[in-house]
């Protein structure tokens, strides 16, 4: 089920925020199997750690800008306002390169959330290994690691995760219907997510099933809970918040695929 890509269309230098990265940094334009264009850039950043404003606190780390999962309901699409990207959400990815973290032990006791506005384990992580590099730099610290993902690639880094005293891995699962999942995102199948959750749980690492977003009339919360209850330490719930650009997209999908749920279609 690994994503298939073919054909590098161009390879050119890229300037980011007015700075020209070193010569090894390039842009690749890749065409997916359906010929949808996806632009991959490698960029240099000064610091990958950001003080988090999320309720969970601590620090937020996003090894990438953008996310190829292209979830139709993704709140992180607002990031385009700050990065200057004009491409549609899900069709660009900036791969961050940063200087080695200075004194990693300063994060002892701090919660570090990996993947608040991207997925650190999307398919390209298999090649770029930026999330793994981050974990390697934090190895030996007492930082509390929290990973948010829709992937099973996190299993690759189980060797590193076992070395931290406090680790939580959360998977977003808002359906058991694979067709609906395919309509909403390009991440791995629900079965692969749940299988990874079980393996991480059996390895002694705390797991979370994040039922988000809940689509009224579509998401069967009870069925998901019954499916994961034996290997999810925590279950989090989040409502569907329709706002911005994706409100139009989601409502268009509902009218087409589930007209019975659209109040406008009810006479």
Residue ranges of each PLM-predicted region?
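Conserved small/polar residues in nucleotide/adenosyl-binding loops
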Residues: 266
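Long, charged alpha-helical interface segments
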Residues: 258-262
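Short, positively charged and aromatic/hydrophobic N-terminal segments
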Residues: 5-8, 12, 16-19, 31
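Conserved Radical SAM active-site core
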Residues: 25, 31-170, 176-180, 190-195, ...
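Conserved C-terminal portion of the radical SAM core fold
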Residues: 192-249
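Short, acidic/turn-prone active-site loops that include or flank metal/cofactor-
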Residues: 173-177, 239-242
């Amino acid at each position: 089920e690994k994503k298939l890509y073919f054909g590098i269309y161009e390879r050119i230098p890229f300037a980011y925020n007015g700075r020209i990265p070193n010569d090894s940094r390039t842009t690749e334009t890749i065409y997916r199997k359906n010929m949808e264009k996806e632009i991959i850039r490698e960029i240099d950043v000064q610091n990958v750690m950001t003080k988090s404003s999320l309720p969970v606190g601590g620090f937020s780390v996003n090894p990438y800008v953008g996310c190829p999962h292209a979830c139709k309901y993704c709140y992180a699409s607002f990031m385009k306002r700050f990065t200057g990207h004009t491409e549609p959400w899900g069709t660009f990815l900036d791969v961050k390169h940063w200087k080695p973290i200075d004194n990693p032990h300063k994060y002892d006791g701090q919660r570090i959330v990996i993947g608040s506005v991207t997925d650190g384990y999307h398919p390209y992580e298999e090649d770029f290994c930026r999330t793994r590099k981050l974990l390697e730099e934090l190895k030996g610290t007492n930082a509390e690691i929290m990973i948010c993902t829709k992937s099973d690639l996190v299993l690759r880094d189980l060797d590193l995760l076992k070395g931290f005293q406090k680790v939580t891995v959360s998977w977003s699962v808002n359906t058991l219907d694979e067709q609906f999942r395919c309509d909403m995102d390009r991440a791995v199948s629900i079965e692969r997510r749940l299988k990874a959750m079980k393996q991480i749980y059996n390895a002694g690492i705390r797991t979370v099933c994040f039922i988000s977003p809940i689509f009224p009339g579509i998401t069967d919360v009870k069925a998901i809970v019954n499916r994961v209850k034996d290997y999810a330490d925590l279950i989090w719930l989040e409502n569907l918040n329709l706002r911005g650009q994706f409100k139009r997209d989601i409502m268009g999908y509902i009218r087409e695929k589930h007209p019975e749920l659209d109040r406008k279609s009810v006479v």
